[in-house]
Design a protein with these regions (language model features):
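Short segments within alpha-helical structural elements
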Residues: 57-113
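Sec/SRP-type N-terminal targeting helices
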Residues: 1-56, 73, 95, 101
Length: 116
């Protein structure tokens, strides 16, 4: 009788430990997903700014610089500096876009695992 009671108590303890581990893993997963969603939102905000402001400014800068250079109002080094600045803006957009896409892929991995 006594060994059986000990085995039951041991099983209950194991069950409680397993449930505790399950809750811990669920919390960690939810926190990870939440963090990915926050990062995606931050990146989306950056992309919106870059699309609506910085990329338009880069386009205007390119047009202005090309026009000024063709009219010989600026030197070649000024032309290069302006083009470099415009290209830096475009490169920044592409880097943020890449980071956004990578974050979406990371988040989707968590959702696709639940279907396996």
């Amino acid at each position: 009788f006594f060994p059986r009671k000990a085995a039951v108590e041991e099983a209950k303890l194991q069950e409680a430990m397993a449930m505790n581990e399950l809750h811990h893993q669920q919390y960690a997963l939810n926190k990870t997903i939440h963090n990915h969603r926050l990062k995606i939102q931050q990146l989306q905000n950056q992309l919106n700014y870059l699309r609506n402001n910085a990329l338009k400014s880069a386009g205007i800068l390119i047009n202005t610089i090309q026009s000024q250079y063709e009219k010989e109002n600026i030197e070649y080094y000024e032309y290069l500096e302006g083009m470099s600045t415009a290209n830096d803006i475009k490169l920044k957009y592409l880097k943020v876009l890449n980071e956004y896409n990578q974050e979406i892929i990371r988040l989707n991995r968590y959702y696709s695992r639940s279907w396996d």
